From Swiss-Prot:
Keyword rRNA-binding part of the UniProt annotation: no
Transmembrane segments: none
GO cellular component: HslUV protease complex; peptidoglycan-based cell wall
Protein name: ATP-dependent Clp protease ATP-binding subunit ClpX
NCBIfam families for this protein: clpX, PRK05342.1
Domain of life where this protein originates: Bacteria
Annotated GO MF terms: ATP binding; ATP hydrolysis activity; ATP-dependent protein folding chaperone; protein dimerization activity; unfolded protein binding; zinc ion binding
Domain ClpX-type ZB: 1-54
PANTHER family per record: ATP-DEPENDENT CLP PROTEASE ATP-BINDING SUBUNIT CLPX-LIKE, MITOCHONDRIAL, ATP-DEPENDENT CLP PROTEASE ATP-BINDING SUBUNIT CLPX-LIKE, MITOCHONDRIAL-RELATED
Species assigned in the record: Mycobacterium tuberculosis (strain ATCC 25618 / H37Rv)
Keywords: ATP-binding, Chaperone, Metal-binding, Nucleotide-binding, Zinc
Chaperone is among the record's keywords: yes
Biological function: ATP-dependent specificity component of the Clp protease. It directs the protease to specific substrates. Can perform chaperone functions in the absence of ClpP. Degrades anti-sigma-D factor RsdA when present in a complex with ClpP1 and ClpP2. Does not seem to act on anti-sigma-L factor RslA.
Binding site for Zn(2+): C13, C16, C35, C38
Length: 426
């Protein structure tokens, strides 16, 4: 029963038995009562069951062509990188499911090894964004780590296990879900050792970090401090198996193209030589011919390279691609700023030559797609400051002159309504 005592008025939860005074809220139903704590517990159970149901099944796993098509909606260009990533990600999650089925099968299982991904390419060309978009499509936990902050265990800096903590946090501390997530390690070229020969002195932020990453890249049972920071003997650890975690490591690898050119051979001189414009050279895939020996010469250790069998490279974006990035993707910058202005009741328009001028500036600055937002902020700052305080603006037009000559955008005044005209005449 829901009442305590023979004639008492004190109600209690029909499920946990706690009295009205022991809980925050008691909700009544036909002959029963339920407390807020039991409701929270029910919600947690339902969420866990739904999360288990949301696990990617092989028949539901998007095919490589579907993954590439999804990426096309968000990322402009980089077709080779999209294809490489689509195949690698599809095979990775297929491998996880093959492992689960293999445990239940009577046939002799074939163990499929993990294929982590190495992404090479200049800054601002979409490496991070490609990985983020992939994680969003697959609905798996995703974490980004910066390799420059990592040091070997026992030295000032972050331990490599802190990368895994970020993934666990992204999965809301659901370790089982985190164990099939994606970790993106950026700036990996900055942990290259200083020369291709093994160092006699300790290189704690270069070769030492590469050595520390080997085990978690390959797959190991790692102990992660729940609060981050350094390990100490008297704390509890979160245990996570990295066997099914997909690692995508990326970097700009400035100078690697020279190493590749030295190996491949310099282009010939004279009448028979191929002449290419600067624009063609800038957008060439310098890393298409990369070999493991080039990466070793750059400063990565052979064991580290061996754990990154899939190599995807991105190229510098040309003017046409940058213009498309501004206007075509689902969350394009132009669409974002149009929405911001709409919230103030003002229409925003960019002329075609204005978009080309913004792309030219990004190329001139050498910041790639990452620099587009900074340029647009500079261009729109004066009107974004004034417009919220004004009610006489209908439209703002950004032209080529606005971008190149730093002049104010064209402001189209709002026509007064009939009632406003009547008030003025009165």
């Amino acid at each position: 029963m829901a009442r305590i005592g023979d004639g008492g008025d004190l109600l209690k939860c029909s499920f946990c038995g706690k009295s009205q005074k022991q809980v925050k809220k008691l909700i009544a139903g036909p002959g029963v009562y339920i407390c807020d704590e039991c409701i929270d517990l029910c919600n947690e159970i339902i969420e866990e069951e739904l999360a288990d149901a949301d696990d990617v099944k092989l028949d539901e796993l998007p095919k490589p062509a579907e993954i590439r098509e999804f990426l096309e909606g968000y990322v402009i260009g980089q077709d080779t990188a999209k294809r490489t990533l689509a195949v690698a990600v599809y095979n990775h999650y297929k491998r996880i499911q093959a492992g689960e089925k293999g445990r239940d099968s009577r046939c002799e299982p074939v163990e499929l090894t993990k294929s982590n991904i190495l992404m090479l390419g200049p800054t601002g060309c979409g490496k991070t964004y490609l990985a983020q978009t992939l994680a969003k499509m697959l609905n798996v936990p995703f974490a980004i780590a910066d390799a420059t902050a990592l040091t070997e265990a026992g030295y000032v800096g972050e331990d490599v296990e802190n990368i895994l903590l970020k993934l666990i946090q992204a999965a809301d501390y659901d370790v089982k879900r985190a164990e099939t997530g994606i970790i993106y390690i950026d700036e990996v070229d900055k942990i290259a050792r200083k020369s291709e020969n093994p160092s006699i002195t300790r290189d704690v932020s270069g070769e030492g970090v590469q050595q520390a990453l080997l085990k978690i890249l390959e797959g190991t049972q790692a102990s992660v401090p729940p609060q981050g920071g350094r390990k100490h003997p008297h704390q509890e650890f979160i245990q996570i198996d990295t066997t099914n975690v997909l690692f995508i490591v990326a970097g700009a690898f400035a100078g690697l193209e020279k190493i590749i050119y030295e190996r491949v051979g310099k282009r010939g001189l004279g009448f028979g030589a191929e002449v290419r414009s600067k624009a063609e050279i800038d957008t060439t895939d310098h890393f298409a011919d990369v070999m493991p020996e080039d990466l070793i010469k750059f400063g990565l250790i052979p064991e580290f390279i061996g754990r990154l069998p899939v190599v995807a490279s991105v190229t510098n974006l040309d003017k046409e691609s940058l213009v498309k990035i501004l206007s075509e993707p689902k969350n394009a910058l132009v669409k974002q700023y149009i929405r911001l202005f709409e919230m103030d009741g003002v229409e925003l328009e960019f002329t075609d030559d204005a978009l080309e001028a913004i792309a030219d500036q990004a190329i001139h600055r050498g910041t790639g797609a990452r620099g587009l937002r900074a340029i647009m902020e500079e261009v729109l700052l004066p009107v974004m400051y004034d417009i919220p305080s004004r009610d006489d603006v209908a439209k703002v037009v950004v032209t080529k002159e606005t971008v190149q000559d730093n002049v104010l955008p064209t402001i189209v005044p709002r026509k007064p309504s009939r009632s406003e005209r009547r008030d003025k005449s009165a």
